[in-house]
Amino acid sequence: MAKNRSRRLRKKMHIDEFQELGFSVAWRFPEGTSEEQIDKTVDDFINEVIEPNKLAFDGSGYLAWEGLICMQEIGKCTEEHQAIVRKWLEERKLDEVRTSELFDVWWD
């Protein structure tokens, strides 16, 4: 049985029109990649992919990176966002590029 919830409560619970979809991403730099090259690649990733598409990235790593991508504002990532991220990483010849299915970043 569906519950009627107020807009305020739906926003607090991140449901319905306030649901936020995101996806996990992971990749690996080739062995021997310098720290400077890793920093430059991650900076370029943020400047060329994340910011222009109004995405947010929370991740970390050294040679092996993993993280979460979601929207900067309340919203839903799309399969197009996944494809843009995957394509950019693969074009840089990074290894083991993986993106997950879209999931609810608050409830999954």
Swiss-Prot record:
Instruction: Give disulfide pairs as residue numbers.
Output: none
**What is this protein identified as?**
Uncharacterized protein YggL
**Superkingdom, natural source:** Bacteria
What is stated as this protein's family in its record? To H.influenzae HI_0341.
Q: Which InterPro entries match?
A: YggL_50S_bp
Q: Name one GO cellular component term.
A: cytosol
One GO BP on record is: ribosome assembly
What is the species of this protein?
A: Escherichia coli (strain K12)
